[in-house]
Amino acid sequence: MADFVLDVPKKNSNQAMKTLIYTLLLFGSLKSENSPYVVVLGIAQDGGLPHAGCVQKCCKKSWSTGENEKVSSIGIIDPKTGQSWLIDATPDFASQLNILENVHNTKLSGIFLTHAHIGHYIGLLQLGREVMGAKNMPVYAMPKMQTFLKNNSPWNQLLSIGNIKILSLQDSKEIKLTRDVYIEPFLVPHRDEFSETVGYRIVSQNRSLVYIPDIDKWSKWDQDIFKVVLHTDYALLDGTFYSSDEIPHRDMSEIPHPFIIETMDLLNDMNSKNRKKIYFIHFNHSNPAINHTSSTSNIIRSKRFNVAKEGLILTL
């Protein structure tokens, strides 16, 4: 099945409500097939859009209109069981959880963490005493990530009072979520100040998806990204920066990511069918590709790559 975008209105208006009703009706026909799927719940880098301290053109409209882009996260949904799982607990956890539970009509069954950078785990605090008071929410983490949560406040309070329980992940070891869905973490090189960093491979009986929101450079990885894309059906890849000139006041060596132009050049020899598997995600506020209708996004699509959008559904 082709990908599908469920647009959840970001502003409260009659037209927005009409759009929501329409998309929910359309979405109902998609769910009738009962295939598991992945939904994109956010596309921005850790700081979101608008970004703290940003008064540049890329943020001005968002500050004035209140429209925003949520921090990157995806949900895994199995309609047969009514269960869902989050990859990463972002600063936008509350609204992303609401989308999973009240738009997609699922029960959150666990959270998989990629690493200990702020956009990927601080949403766990919403599970605590001050907000949800959750009971033993499964949180899946790699060894160093576990140690970080257990040895630092306020995260260790979530454990001590039973808001969360930590379940262990191992590199390249598959975990069964339901009869039809598996997930496998794999290590990727990233700054790793507080924990290791992983991407995820999500597999059903029919299709597979790779999610890598953060990596330093493809050349530093012990896997060949070209081959990884060839052997999957969808690849959501780090698109933090489009090029090196986006934030001239910052030392880019301190925040390494593969530029989108680098990734497109690296994978340019792929045929069009394989390039269309790729969706860039995790856009910095400075990256013009965060605007789905920008000329930069159009350039990416003209090269037969894709730009992820909140609400995108990829059927497994």
Give the location of each predicted region:
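Sec-dependent N-terminal signal peptides
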Residues: 19-28
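Positively charged n-region of N-terminal signal peptides that target proteins for export
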Residues: 11, 15-20
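Core dinuclear metal-dependent hydrolase active-site scaffold
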Residues: 33-100, 166-228, 312-316
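Active-site metal-binding motif and surrounding structural segment of the metallo-beta-lactamase
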Residues: 77-140, 233
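Cap/insert and terminal regions of metallo-dependent hydrolase folds
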Residues: 203-208, 215-312
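A short, active-site helix/loop in glycosyltransferases that binds the activated sugar's phosphate group
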Residues: 144-153
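Short hydrophobic alpha-helical segments enriched in small aliphatic residues
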Residues: 5-8
